[in-house]
Amino acid sequence: MSQSKQYVMTYEGVKKLESELEYLKTVKRKEITEKIKIALGYGDLSENSEYDEAKNDQAFTEGRIIQLENMLKNAVVVDESEIPSDIVSVGSKVKVKDYEFDEEVEYSIVGSAEADPMNFKISNESPVGNALVGKKVGDVVEVTVPDGVNKFEILGISRS
């Protein structure tokens, strides 16, 4: 019997997924059911793009619900009181100097299920996140990227 993947998450990440799941189950499902009813009223299903679109939306939504339920069932929540303030780990905020762009950036290290790189939430499994985890202030890490190697110096660590 294979084991399910465990999802390391912060408390905030779990709450966000629970909120999305609740929305999909209570609001989105009703919207889709209504769209399907309306589309069925148009008659012939063989050329009914509204019906096809609603059924595709339904399939995507049901798939996402299953995915969220699985992630929440297998979530391992990081105890924020146990997040060290001197070593980078899931739940840490890390201020780094990015040598490629010569700028300071602050990342939140999160589990893969709650990663949002556009908002500086990077997964502990991503190349940069993985390189930072376990390091301390003053450490310099090198991360291999498609166009070469990026260097980051850890300037500060705090709890998220």
Curated annotation (Swiss-Prot):
A Pfam family matched in the record: GreA_GreB
Superkingdom field: Bacteria
Family annotation (PROSITE patterns): GREAB_1, GREAB_2
Keywords: Coiled coil, DNA-binding, Transcription, Transcription regulation
Keyword Transcription: yes
GO BP annotations, alphabetical order: DNA-templated transcription elongation; regulation of DNA-templated transcription elongation
Coiled-coil region(s): 49-75
Gene Ontology MF annotations: DNA binding; RNA polymerase binding
InterPro entries: GreA/GreB_C_sf (IPR036953), TF_GreA/GreB_CS (IPR018151), Tscrpt_elong_fac_GreA (IPR006359), Tscrpt_elong_fac_GreA/B (IPR028624), Tscrpt_elong_fac_GreA/B_C (IPR001437), Tscrpt_elong_fac_GreA/B_fam (IPR023459), Tscrpt_elong_fac_GreA/B_N (IPR022691), Tscrpt_elong_fac_GreA/B_N_sf (IPR036805)
Record's function text: Necessary for efficient RNA polymerase transcription elongation past template-encoded arresting sites. The arresting sites in DNA have the property of trapping a certain fraction of elongating RNA polymerases that pass through, resulting in locked ternary complexes. Cleavage of the nascent transcript by cleavage factors such as GreA or GreB allows the resumption of elongation from the new 3'terminus. GreA releases sequences of 2 to 3 nucleotides.
Family to which this protein belongs: Belongs to the GreA/GreB family.
Descriptive protein name: Transcription elongation factor GreA
Source organism per UniProt: Clostridium beijerinckii (strain ATCC 51743 / NCIMB 8052)
